[in-house]
Design a protein with these regions (language model features):
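Acidic, glycine-rich A-domain
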Residues: 42-43, 69, 92-105, 112-264
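Active-site oxyanion-binding pockets that recognize sulfate/phosphate
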Residues: 14, 108-111
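Acidic/polar low-complexity segments with low predicted structural confidence
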Residues: 1-101, 249, 255, 263
Length: 264
């Protein structure tokens, strides 16, 4: 995927109109589709807990018995004399977890330094929104907030909605995220940001504490891309980590693992 080209489009789209803008939207969609195709199955498998039936499960119980595979693999052991199938090998498939509805709230910082993470976050929101047990709330923010939850399944729309410039008010965005929490223990709040707060740091800490205390899961992703090599405000990050939130950069597949473990 040509991430560099898409970053340039985002930076210059305010100068585009007509056919040029339409072409830019097509490129955004193509890049998003390419990323999704690359990540889709890996992320969904991490999140659903569904194991490939070609892989034997370590949990061997009747609920996990792969009946068809067991019969198929033991046909060679059929005893004609006794008219019985001798089961010499028993096969088990992975467990399929049952889920309550989970709410994933993703807040994306529009800062220019976060462009790569914005692109991957938009695609991740689409992938997660396609899961039957997940409900995605998606916002982008600087000093104002835009709720794109109705477009969580359209990463190109999210990407082309980004408005670079202006300040950053993470506390304000997180306060809005808090208002979207209904069942805390079934909620994960993910803020994709470099943590350079232009608003009130005290409010940021207070709201973070409230979310964690409620039982919801709070994460600050300082990078979400293939490199996961973030530049961020480490002092603020340390304070948030000390109170119990996750702070750090993740690759998309690692984010899938992380969310999967949270709701395991």
């Amino acid at each position: 995927p040509d991430i560099a080209l898409l970053k340039t489009i985002i930076q210059l789209k305010h100068l585009m109109n007509g056919e040029v803008l339409q072409a830019a939207v097509k490129i955004a969609k193509q890049v998003a589709d390419d990323i999704k195709q690359k990540l889709d199955m890996t992320i969904k498998r991490s999140l659903t807990g569904r194991l490939d039936k070609n892989t034997s499960s370590v949990t061997k119980c009747s609920a996990n018995l792969d009946f068809k595979k067991t019969i198929r693999r033991n046909l060679k052991n059929y005893d004609k004399a006794s008219n019985q199938l001798i089961l010499k090998d028993i096969y088990f498939s992975g467990r399929v977890k049952k889920h309550n509805k989970k709410r994933i709230i993703i807040a994306i910082d529009e800062s220019g330094s976060m462009l790569g993470s914005v692109i991957y976050s938009a695609v991740m929101a689409q992938i997660i929104s396609e899961l039957p047990f997940a409900e995605v709330k998606l916002i982008i923010f600087d000093t104002s907030i835009v709720d794109l939850s109705d477009h969580a399944d359209d990463p190109a729309q999210t990407i082309m909605s980004v408005q670079l410039g202006g300040g950053t008010d993470i506390a304000k965005a997180l306060t809005y995220c808090e208002s979207l929490i209904i069942t805390p223990r079934d909620t994960c709040v993910i803020v994709v940001t470099d943590l350079y707060e232009g608003g009130s740091e005290a409010q940021l800490m207070n709201v973070s504490k409230n979310i964690i205390t409620s039982g919801a899961h709070l994460s600050f992703l300082t990078a979400l891309d293939e490199n996961a090599d973030p530049a961020y405000d480490k002092a603020t990050g340390q304070k948030l980590a000390d109170m119990g939130s996750f702070v750090g950069g993740l690759t998309p597949d690692k984010l899938g693992d992380y969310i999967g473990k949270i709701f395991a």
